[in-house]
Amino acid sequence: MSSACDAGDHYPLHLLVWKNDYRQLEKELQGQNVEAVDPRGRTLLHLAVSLGHLESARVLLRHKADVTKENRQGWTVLHEAVSTGDPEMVYTVLQHRDYHNTSMALEGVPELLQKILEAPDFYVQMKWEFTSWVPLVSRICPNDVCRIWKSGAKLRVDITLLGFENMSWIRGRRSFIFKGEDNWAELMEVNHDDKVVTTERFDLSQEMERLTLDLMKPKSREVERRLTSPVINTSLDTKNIAFERTKSGFWGWRTDKAEVVNGYEAKVYTVNNVNVITKIRTEHLTEEEKKRYKADRNPLESLLGTVEHQFGAQGDLTTECATANNPTAITPDEYFNEEFDLKDRDIGRPKELTIRTQKFKAMLWMCEEFPLSLVEQVIPIIDLMARTSAHFARLRDFIKLEFPPGFPVKIEIPLFHVLNARITFGNVNGCSTAEESVSQNVEGTQADSASHITNFEVDQSVFEIPESYYVQDNGRNVHLQDEDYEIMQFAIQQSLLESSRSQELSGPASNGGISQTNTYDAQYERAIQESLLTSTEGLCPSALSETSRFDNDLQLAMELSAKELEEWELRLQEEEAELQQVLQLSLTDK
């Protein structure tokens, strides 16, 4: 077995962190690799945070330790900071995380603008259709047509779906215009409804100089929210992903399926073995918070094929020499010896972990003759939009997989447990001005000729602001995508709660009977709310406690929905069997 001396030889910086000798650590870090990993897969910063050594963590953060690094189990530094239950640790890590993310976003803009500049000019429409297998839920699923113009280093993206409030989707006409020139960039958000433009032109290098750690101080309620909510880490497991051609026809005459999408023939693929893995940790919560979380658990999961594994704390392994962040009294000799088996022991607060795995299927329509390039033209724009849109972020993660040959003219991917997004590309280079797009639909036809595609030019008026619009300078507000995402989820949750309460108080129908439509709508709206809550890290305890009384009604509603779906699938199987029997009889008669 290795000794502490051996650990000092092989992992000297890690040993200083273990001892929380932060003064010596400060001296020794000069010229050293701050991202070195120990035998257990932890960087210096991960080790400091897991052990609750705030002083060492601050030293490492001053030396630019990567606050976004994941450990061997896929947890980030912020996840581990929340697990300690130390508000000061969470505050420090969160501040540096936000500073790092904002810095990286600004640093990535020049490269992104260069990619956009080098790509051929084009116009394309992306139709977003949100669908659900749950009956009645599909009634409130929205559609949107996203219109994109690209000319040189200029980009314009038009959307009409703005948000969700009071059980209805908020619509409006918005344009986001990006202009790049050398080290300058101009960002404009155009509100066509109010004729107001928020704009800012800035020097990227100066922005980096102005950006300071003090500007990224988190609010106290943000720290409190994280400490009173479960730590949730959702990831897409695609290591066993498989693209299979979808078949069409009857038994014995089945062929590879192909469909025409907006004038282009596309091969249809089913994407199998896509797993959404959700890890939930609750060891930092009080017993009351844990009970509240368990009471508000998602009743959809039993109906959606979710496989769940729970792992308890290491209470039976705790020794007299243990500390709060080393409950099983692991010694440095044991920890830094890669040949020593720690079994179920580990540093950090004993984990109370739940792992949920759900399989999803996605669909792809691939066209090898599509005039756009996914890598050169489309991905840079999706990268840009993913910085402020959770839906674009999910699409970006998916399209960066290794697809079959061609361009994905149509994609269907899961967004949440009961919601899918279907994205269709169309009307390529069919619109050179903003006025033309108003009357056009994504179901456009193929471009008339190859020359029309290759010589396409965007009218520069697309990127200009109408004279009648009011321009508001210096209105930019730096957003972090994960916080926008949580705010969006919370808004949906609150809207659904208000709607459910109003429908519950509405009483019986005018004819004295029960209002079935309102009751079912409330149940299915609640289903969406519960589904969305499990997909976000920002759960609101007060709102969650208000919803527990609906669980029984929702469970019954979802069981009825699942039964209806099962009966529908059974009818389809019976019809296909009858068709096959008729076909065989006709062959026999011949």
Swiss-Prot record:
Q: Name one GO cellular component term.
A: plasma membrane
Question: Any notes on this protein's domains?
Answer: The UIM repeats 3 and 4 are required for binding to ubiquitinated EGFR and 'Lys-63'-linked ubiquitin.
**Residues modified to Phosphoserine:** S205, S586
Q: Where is the UIM domain?
A: 483-502, 519-538, 549-568, 574-590
What are the UniProt keywords, alphabetically? ANK repeat, Cell membrane, Endosome, Membrane, Phosphoprotein, Repeat, Ubl conjugation
Q: Name one GO biological process term.
A: negative regulation of protein localization to endosome
Q: Mind telling me what this protein is named?
A: Ankyrin repeat domain-containing protein 13A
Q: What is its main location?
A: membrane
Q: What does this protein do?
A: Ubiquitin-binding protein that specifically recognizes and binds 'Lys-63'-linked ubiquitin. Does not bind 'Lys-48'-linked ubiquitin. Positively regulates the internalization of ligand-activated EGFR by binding to the Ub moiety of ubiquitinated EGFR at the cell membrane.
Q: How does it assemble?
A: Interacts (via the UIM 3 and 4 repeats) with EGFR (ubiquitinated); the interaction is direct, inhibited by ANKRD13A monoubiquitination and may regulate EGFR internalization.
Q: What does the PTM comment state?
A: Monoubiquitinated, inhibits interaction with ubiquitinated EGFR.
Q: Which GO terms describe its molecular function?
A: ubiquitin-modified protein reader activity
Cellular compartments annotated: Cell membrane; Late endosome
